[in-house]
Amino acid sequence: MIGLNHYLIVSGLLFCIGLAGMLKRKNILLLFFSTEIMLNAINIGFVAISKYTHNLDGQMFALFIIAIAASEVAIGLGLVILWFKKFKSLDIDSLNAMKG
């Protein structure tokens, strides 16, 4: 039988993969993907704990995170497209070329 520990281990591993992607990658698009992996790992943890404690708060919070992540992707992808049109690169090191 799959217990709570198994879900939390998978959630922790996914979060570590996302964190490693955030620290290792220089591409803005891959940073967004890594952020989404970390958010999904958090959702797995919330839903697993919610299921095993018979409390719906974790599931409601996971739905809220999904909604926030969807809006983040919509806004972030729009900004990435504009960034690529202007600078022809998605490299994070070119961020210091911004003037403000």
Swiss-Prot record:
UniProt-listed Enzyme Commission number(s): 7.1.1.-
Gene Ontology cellular component terms for the protein in this record: NADH dehydrogenase complex; plasma membrane
Gene Ontology BP terms: ATP synthesis coupled electron transport
One MF term in the entry's GO annotations: quinone binding
Keyword annotations of the record: Cell inner membrane, Cell membrane, Membrane, NAD, Quinone, Translocase, Transmembrane, Transmembrane helix, Transport, Ubiquinone
Topology within the bilayer: Multi-pass membrane protein
Main localization (coarse): membrane
Pfam families listed in its UniProt record: Oxidored_q2
InterPro entries found in the cross-reference section: NADH_UbQ_OxRdtase_chain4L/K, NUOK/Mnh_C1-like
Transmembrane feature ranges: 1-21, 28-48, 64-84
Reactions mediated catalytically: a quinone + NADH + 5 H(+)(in) = a quinol + NAD(+) + 4 H(+)(out)
UniProt subcellular location: Cell inner membrane
Source taxon at top rank: Bacteria
Broad class of enzyme this protein falls into: translocase
Quaternary structure and partners: NDH-1 is composed of 14 different subunits. Subunits NuoA, H, J, K, L, M, N constitute the membrane sector of the complex.
NCBIfam families listed in its UniProt record: PRK05715.1-2, PRK05715.1-3, PRK05715.1-5
Record function comment: NDH-1 shuttles electrons from NADH, via FMN and iron-sulfur (Fe-S) centers, to quinones in the respiratory chain. The immediate electron acceptor for the enzyme in this species is believed to be ubiquinone. Couples the redox reaction to proton translocation (for every two electrons transferred, four hydrogen ions are translocated across the cytoplasmic membrane), and thus conserves the redox energy in a proton gradient.
Family: Belongs to the complex I subunit 4L family.
Protein name: NADH-quinone oxidoreductase subunit K
Species for this entry: Helicobacter pylori (strain Shi470)
Higher taxonomy: Bacteria, Pseudomonadati, Campylobacterota, Epsilonproteobacteria, Campylobacterales
